[in-house]
């Protein structure tokens, strides 16, 4: 079964709500809410203790998805990446997304190129999270969102950028 928007099913005796929240990480992002169990399965909307990677965007959809998860009556949140969390984990991912959006916008508006911008964004508040080099993809996606047609979308180029940043940070 495919769906758009929201789809509710009864599985056994449990109500299960499937909610479309993308595109964000990819074009087909959805979460699953089991209200009776106060549990949300977020798929790739949440990366806990790791830098998320924005392949599709727009990033505003991802921020909105985090906001929506925060409104659900859920105490158990199962991310697509990393350990189970609570709403504090959702808030940290949201904080990261807002931060990189705002920092990338400043650099874009100042005329800085996407790779240079990715290199210059401090990630101190997210130290200890894995895969910091993903900032390269995130900034390129944001630059395209800001209207910069020169920011690459080719996965091969973006993986090359991530490799450069990984080497730079070691």
Where do the protein language model's features map onto the residues?
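Metallo-beta-lactamase
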Residues: 8, 15, 20-106
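Sec-exported extracytoplasmic/periplasmic mature domains
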Residues: 67-74, 98, 102-112, 119-126, ...
């Amino acid at each position: 079964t495919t769906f758009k928007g929201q789809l509710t099913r009864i599985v056994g005796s449990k109500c299960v709500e499937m909610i479309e929240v993308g595109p964000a990480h990819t074009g087909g992002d959805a979460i699953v809410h089991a209200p009776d169990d106060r549990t949300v399965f977020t798929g790739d909307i949440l990366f806990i203790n790791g830098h998320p990677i924005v392949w599709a965007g727009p990033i505003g959809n991802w921020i909105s998805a985090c906001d929506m998860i925060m409104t659900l009556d859920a105490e158990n949140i199962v991310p697509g990446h990393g350990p189970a969390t609570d709403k504090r984990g959702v808030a940290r991912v949201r904080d990261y997304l807002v931060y990189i959006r705002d920092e990338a916008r400043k650099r874009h508006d100042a005329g800085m190129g996407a790779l240079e911008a990715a290199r210059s964004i401090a990630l101190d508040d997210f130290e200890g999270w894995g895969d910091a080099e993903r900032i390269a993809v995130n900034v390129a996606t944001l630059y395209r969102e800001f209207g910069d047609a020169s920011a690459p979308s080719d996965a091969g180029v973006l993986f090359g950028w991530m490799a450069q940043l990984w080497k730079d940070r070691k």
